[in-house]
Design a protein with these regions (language model features):
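NAD(P)-dependent Rossmann-like dehydrogenase/reductase catalytic/cofactor-binding core
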Residues: 224, 231-360
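Rossmann-like NAD(P)(H) cofactor-binding subdomain of soluble oxidoreductases
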Residues: 82-144
Length: 360
């Protein structure tokens, strides 16, 4: 199968390596402002990996020419933070062809709909099937351009939904060889809500701001950054997320329970579960507060949850407090920026029942 991977960061290189390891012909694309891994993969002819997946896997092409990456592609993975989805969609728009599958990996806030909007596709358009995953399939870090370390490949708790959801089974069948543990979600509201990053990352970062600024992230983010008090904040945010899911008729698995299913954690608790987690061992904190744990997971993820809660009548006082505090720390108005909400996706006028019907 011919696979195009858009995004050459941690996740993109992880997806490209794994797909190539399963015998697929992989092309890697990124924008010109991100040349590091593209140049390295061009020079080396592929991607090197260490960790639970090891070795070297060839990549057919790596470059900044989107038409070359998409030509003949059966599956297109858009892999990057939430703010990459719209640019990926817009650059793909003239080159997408009928029958292709696009998977936004991961989506924390309606990434599949954001891609459809950016690519000029109708919500119910099935000529090009667009889907999203609930999270990245790996804990992965770039060691250097073109060289990655995969700490964990999810053993379960990885969900996928297409728009409309009736195409979910078809997409799963196409990716089953690489992701055998991937499961069908009810719809993209479930995949969007099941992403735990907005629950975990902002809380841990917020409670460790002094340590991050003082040490430039020279500590283990999960093993050293989580204490019982930090765990209580994570749990409070998680409760509000789960309540939104209940109102929308979708099951949201509590984050520690999901962490055990995925193979990150050995126990389903909000404190020691992270502190002793085998899948997070060795993962360092970010070197700066100006990082996706605030800019994406608050600016997109938590703002999306807060606005969605408002829409369906679920109070989110803890989520709102985290947004307010982080906005003050970063001298930004994340709520006012409203980078991605149900309104920006074109879905703010619908009730919970109407959304369920619309996305089915």
């Amino acid at each position: 199968m011919n696979i195009a991977v858009l995004g050459s960061g941690n996740g993109g290189c992880g997806v490209a390596f794994d797909c190539a390891a399963h015998g697929h012909q992989v092309s890697l694309f990124d924008f010109k402002q991100f040349p590091g891994s593209i140049r390295a993969v061009q020079h080396n002819g592929g991607i090197r990996c260490e960790g639970i997946l090891e070795g070297f896997q060839p990549v057919v092409s790596a470059g900044h020419e989107i038409e070359k990456a998409l030509d003949g592609a059966d599956i297109i993975y858009a892999v990057g933070p939430a703010y990459s989805t719209r640019p990926f969609a817009e650059v793909c728009k003239p080159h997408l062809t009928q029958g292709q599958i696009v998977i936004v990996c991961p989506s924390s806030c309606g990434g599949s709909i954001e891609f459809k909007n950016g690519a000029g596709l109708n919500l119910r358009d099935e000529g090009i099937v667009v889907a999203e995953t609930s999270t990245l399939p790996y804990a992965v870090r770039l060691l250097e351009p073109g060289n990655i370390k995969i700490f964990n490949k999810l053993k379960g708790g990885l969900f996928l939904a297409a728009v409309p959801a009736k195409n979910t089974k078809y997409v799963l069948e196409q990716v089953r060889d690489v992701y055998p543990s991937m499961s069908a979600a009810k719809n993209i509201l479930q995949t969007s809500l099941q992403n735990g990053n907005p629950v975990i990352h902002p809380a841990i970062t917020l409670m460790n701001v002094a340590l991050i600024e003082r040490t430039k992230g020279d500590f283990e983010f999960y093993h050293e950054g989580v204490t019982p008090a930090v765990g209580r904040l994570i749990e409070a945010v998680d409760r509000e997320r789960i309540a939104i899911g209940e109102k929308l008729g979708v099951e949201v698995i509590p984050d520690p329970k999901l962490g055990v299913i995925q193979g990150y954690m050995a126990e389903a608790t909000y404190d020691t579960g992270f502190i002793t987690s085998p899948g997070f061992a060795g993962v360092k904190a970010q070197s700066s507060l100006d990082y996706r744990y605030f800019n994406e997971d608050v600016g997109y993820g938590l703002v999306f949850l807060q606005k969605l809660g408002e829409q369906v009548g679920v109070a989110t006082p803890v989520i709102s407090a985290v947004i307010t505090l982080v906005s003050q720390l970063m001298n930004r108005d994340y709520l006012g920026e409203a980078r991605r909400t149900m309104e920006t996706l074109g879905l703010s006028k619908h009730t919970a029942e109407e959304l369920e019907t619309l996305l089915a």
